[in-house]
Amino acid sequence: MINNTNSNISIKAVGKKIRISPHKMRKVIDQIRGRSYEQALMILEFMPYKACNYVLKLLSSVAANANHNFGLNKSDLFIEKIIADGGPKLKRFQPRAQGRGYPILKPTCNLMIVVKVKS
């Protein structure tokens, strides 16, 4: 999605059904919210969490979109908005004794990143 008003360009990328809980994803995205693209890359590269790989992949995608579609320089971008919401839950069952089964809900999350050009 592209919003272009008064030469304020914001570029958005969305990742859906990512197999990690939104709680774990928010632990990572809170560290990079409002930072520049280059600072966010540095932070994500050295954080020891699984969620960093998903955020890094989507962040590089939104930067590539900005570069390809608008010719914007990646070093001029900063993260305006980043949100991790809950996605659909995968429903599984754990077999238990005497024919019972306990439900297991495996969470997924939807990640949205919006970047803007530094003014």
Curated annotation (Swiss-Prot):
List UniProt keywords, sorted A-Z: Chloroplast, Plastid, Ribonucleoprotein, Ribosomal protein, RNA-binding, rRNA-binding
> Any idea which GO molecular function terms this record carries?
rRNA binding; structural constituent of ribosome
Q: Which PROSITE patterns match?
A: RIBOSOMAL_L22
* Name of the gene encoding the protein in the UniProt record: rpl22
The record's annotation in InterPro entries points to:
Ribosomal_uL22, Ribosomal_uL22_bac/chlpt-type, Ribosomal_uL22_bac/org-type, Ribosomal_uL22_CS, Ribosomal_uL22_sf
Q: Which SUPFAM superfamilies match?
A: Ribosomal protein L22
- Give the primary localization class: plastid
Q: Is Secreted one of the keywords UniProt gives this record?
A: no
Identification of the protein by name: Large ribosomal subunit protein uL22c
